[in-house]
């Protein structure tokens, strides 16, 4: 059994906790939704939810859709909310033994572009490897005509300090992949192990639980993931951590 000291909490993947983040998560997964639905899946007050929605609208991430109002009897109609068309894109890079996957995603997590680059990292210096994939990333982002928001990188093996990768199948021993990317892209860059990234992706598919009734405890959720391929690993994800 793995000793407790060997179990790490991911510094990269955190579930939504702020009112705006919780609202955004629910809208992203269940759109169109009303403010009432958001209140039902939050522990925050109705005024707090209203302020969170206003902040998301002001940030051009969410919009009201009066044309989708469904009559539900007397009273003020509830205006549905949905996400706006993605205002920027996110890049995902999955490093493999013989090929690297590149994906361009919108704010809802939808795939916009994808490409495999056939390259064996173990046969190249880090600088040469990055020089090979950067033109593909630039071309894919340019084709969307949208600004780049951030870059996420997953790799086999072990990732330390969100920066250094040690993976025998890649031929890397404590290689720094963040600094070369940071020289070329002025956006946040995150790095995680592949099993950590898979758990983080699963975490982002979980809708916040319904508001508890009275003293009833908040419903919990846990998922256990095993990964066996060029590397092996395991991770547990909850709604708030990996």
Language-model-detected regions and their locations in the chain:
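Glycine-rich phosphate-binding loop and adjoining helix at the ATP-binding site
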Residues: 111, 118-214, 221
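Beta-hairpin "wing" of winged helix-turn-helix
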Residues: 57-74
């Amino acid at each position: 059994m793995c000793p407790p000291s060997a179990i790490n909490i991911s510094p990269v993947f955190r579930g939504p906790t702020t009112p705006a983040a919780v609202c955004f998560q629910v809208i992203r997964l269940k759109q169109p939704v009303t403010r009432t639905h958001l209140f039902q899946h939050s522990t925050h007050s109705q005024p707090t939810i209203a302020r969170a929605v206003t902040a998301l609208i002001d940030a051009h991430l969410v919009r009201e859709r009066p044309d989708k109002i469904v009559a539900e009897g007397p009273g003020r109609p509830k205006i549905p909310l949905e996400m706006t068309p993605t205002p920027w894109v996110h890049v995902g890079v999955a490093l493999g033994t013989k090929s690297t996957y590149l994906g361009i995603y919108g704010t809802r997590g939808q795939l916009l572009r994808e490409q495999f680059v056939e390259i064996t990292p173990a046969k190249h210096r880090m600088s040469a490897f990055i020089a090979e994939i950067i033109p593909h990333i630039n071309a894919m982002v340019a084709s969307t005509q949208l600004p780049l928001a951030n870059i996420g990188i997953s790799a086999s093996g072990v990732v330390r300090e969100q920066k250094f990768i040690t993976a025998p199948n890649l031929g890397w021993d404590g290689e720094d992949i963040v600094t070369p990317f940071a020289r070329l892209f002025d956006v946040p860059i995150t790095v995680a192990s592949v099993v950590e990234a898979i758990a983080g992706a699963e975490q982002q598919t979980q809708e916040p639980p319904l508001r508890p009734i009275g003293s009833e405890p908040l419903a919990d959720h846990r998922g256990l993931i095993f990964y066996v391929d060029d590397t092996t690993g395991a991770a547990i994800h909850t709604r708030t951590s990996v």
